Amino acid sequence: MSIMSYTGGTVVAMAGDECVCIASDLRIGEQMTTIATDQKKVHKVTDKVYVGLAGFQSDARTVLEKIMFRKNLYELRENRNIKPQVLSEMISNLAYQHRFGSYFTEPLVAGLDDTNKPYICCMDTIGCVSAPRDFVAVGTGQEYLLGVCENFWRENMKPDELFEATAQSILSCLERDAASGWGAVVYTITKDKVNVSTIKARMD
């Protein structure tokens, strides 16, 4: 078994009309043994920018600490909130610096910029960025998510529609991926607020 799928976990993000959704499952395991059922893989960076970390969760915790350190340093120097595009480049540089002994985690960035334009991207373990305009997914359930997201995603979806599409996509993934599960948490980021919803799913 690959170290990338050792602890399991899936993160997905979708872009809408001045809104984005990012969701993850809640399971952390040791291969097929479930260790905990409340492991959130999505973390707040600013009020409008969130990062999801799939892969080996020990490395994900280390990467998160480094991301927050660099983000705080950036905001002290620049005296402004970090944009999602800048954060993705920062994480990409961090990953590429460690390419010869890379962190076993796949980061995903989702958020709104200063004009409330949605931005989503994901990257591999050495920081190669993929930034489509529709949806991204990382983790053990990625192969199950992409086709489902293709079916649910529409252009210019409003927050309620986007939440429904993201929630249905991750629930469909949790039905099929044995390394993810025990419910999901969905963050809907709009220009005014962030809604956090916890969804029940299969408990096996």
Curated annotation (Swiss-Prot):
Complex and partners: The 26S proteasome consists of a 20S proteasome core and two 19S regulatory subunits. The 20S proteasome core is composed of 28 subunits that are arranged in four stacked rings, resulting in a barrel-shaped structure. The two end rings are each formed by seven alpha subunits, and the two central rings are each formed by seven beta subunits. The catalytic chamber with the active sites is on the inside of the barrel.
Job of this protein: Non-catalytic component of the proteasome, a multicatalytic proteinase complex which is characterized by its ability to cleave peptides with Arg, Phe, Tyr, Leu, and Glu adjacent to the leaving group at neutral or slightly basic pH. The proteasome has an ATP-dependent proteolytic activity.
SUPFAM superfamilies: N-terminal nucleophile aminohydrolases (Ntn hydrolases)
Gene behind this protein: pbs-3
Organism: Caenorhabditis elegans
Listed GO CC annotations: cytosol; nucleus; proteasome core complex, beta-subunit complex
Gene Ontology BP terms: proteasome-mediated ubiquitin-dependent protein catabolic process
Protein name (database record): Proteasome subunit beta type-3
InterPro entries named in the record: Ntn_hydrolases_N, Proteasome_beta_3, Proteasome_bsu_CS, Proteasome_sua/b, Proteasome_suB-type
